[in-house]
Amino acid sequence: MPPSRYRENEESKAVWVYLEQEEGTLENVSLEVLSKGRELADVMKWKLVGLLPGSGVHALAKEAITRGADEIWVMDHPLLTTFTIEGHGAVVYDAVMLGKPSIFLLGATHNGRDLAGRLAVRFRTGLNADCTNLHMDEKDALLVSEVSGFGGGVVAMIEMQNHRPQMATVRPGVFALSEPDSARRGKVIDVPVNLKPEQIKTRILERVRSGVVDLTRVPVLVVGGRGVNGDFETLKKLAEILGGDVGAT
């Protein structure tokens, strides 16, 4: 593998988290990863930074600080209103190359996976995808990513020795969401955005809501398999009592 864009001797001792937002709301998985990032940063006595691209998103920066971030780098631009891989990929790449964090984490959403793969190639670094746990090797100051395979029968522990940033995407729902601390203070940094309309090759013509529940946002999920023989009414009643929703295997 060729050398990455920056090496371990050039890195800043910080954990960075990509904060994905949709129509003015931070994705739950971004807040979950931010909570875990706080834990990792505290172990190493490093700084936790959130990276927030969008349009009119400064209020979300304050929310992220209450969830544990020390700094939020805001990239506010009309061309970032809706996620596009060209726009978000460009501004996030520029910001990471400016800050050179040791660790960069993203939620494993559709957009997060798209962005992470593209950035890993541009950084010439590795990417540990769909991680189920993260912890620090304190002795060597390395991120240890746990990735399951073969239906969960094998768990690999992966470290990135020399390439930076150490990148990982995290599955939704694997980390607990920390309680917001309204008294917490942090720094909001406005990062200049140099984007031109001709850079954006993707246009959103129409958005159609499917009406299907986003299971990653459901607090309780009651799941039935073939054994219920298609009779989900009891499960629906139980899910209603528990304040959740119904799924199937």
What are the language-model segments listed below?
Residues 1-249:
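N-terminal glycine-rich FAD/FM-binding segment characteristic of electron-transfer flavoproteins
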